[in-house]
Amino acid sequence: MTKRLVHANITSVMNDERRKQTEQKLIRSGRAEFLEKGYAKANLRDICKAARVTTGAFYFSFENKEALLAAILDLVITDYQRMCSVFAKREEDDPGTADDNERQMMEYLSAHRTEAIILMEKSAGSRYEGFKSQIDMQMQSAFTSYFSKFMGVSPDAELIRILVSMRLQGYMELIKGDYTVEERIRLAREIGIHADAGTMALIKYLNGQKEVYRK
């Protein structure tokens, strides 16, 4: 290999390393900007200023503001969806895995609090703004199936919507609150116990109401 080729390879490696460093600076800066202002109000110049890079360097790394948001959120979304799928299958096969699944999910969300908050509350105006609604609909479907199983009929849709909204709000409080991982896991377990007991009491009440209406 000639000296010229060696020099070219070294230069290429150095350029790649600088580009990666620039991208990481922009991702850190963008994460903070999106968390503070939300996607719609986040300013590219402020992101670049905080990262100490030029706007030209930004566009060399990312096509636009949404591409930066994608670099921040896509991996977390992929991991979250994979974990939900794996955990659902595990619990179906062995309900005793629920506590361990809850722990793993809380550990992951604790490590990615900022991304979770941006995704659920700060992504309006981006292609991710429907993610919260998607989660909401999935939970409504799961709640409806569960209630139907024990009631023999479909529950009131508005009741399910409110119950899901309350459950999601509880999860967001855990994510946003200044808790340790262990505290989040404990609180999630206690909230779950309360929710399970309340759900069964509600189903019993609703079944009783059905009997009253029959008479």
Per-region residue spans from a language model:
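Hydrophobic/aromatic-rich alpha-helical bundle segments in the mid-to-C-terminal region
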Residues: 117-121, 147-215
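Short, basic, alpha-helical segments at the C-terminal edge of helix-turn-helix-like DNA-binding modules
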Residues: 44, 74-81
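Alpha-helical DNA-contacting segments of helix-turn-helix folds
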Residues: 62, 69-76, 119, 128-132
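Amphipathic alpha-helical packing segments from all-alpha helical-bundle domains
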Residues: 81-84, 104-107, 111, 125-151, ...
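Short linear capping/connector segments at secondary-structure termini
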Residues: 85-90, 118-126
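N-terminal intrinsically disordered/low-complexity leader segments
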Residues: 1-19, 207-215
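Hydrophobic alpha-helical connector segments
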Residues: 71, 85-111
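Helix-turn-helix
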Residues: 25, 29, 33-67, 71
